[in-house]
């Protein structure tokens, strides 16, 4: 359901998968609607972590 969250949900998902270290999860980011993540697995993870930490963690923590 988090995938339907949009930008916030997308970053949140990116941070979770990125932290897990599963490159396969990069495909999940594309489903969220963030083509940037799908553009590059390595680059996407790094960018996702930075963006996720700043926005995803705050929003995600509340949802958890």
Curated annotation (Swiss-Prot):
Annotated family: Belongs to the orthopoxvirus OPG024 family.
Biased composition (Gly residues): 49-64
Domain of life of the source: Viruses
Protein name: OPG024 protein
Pfam families assigned to the protein according to its UniProt record, in alphabetical order: Orthopox_C10L (PF07020)
Region of interest (Disordered), ranges: 1-64
Bias type Low complexity, positions: 23-34
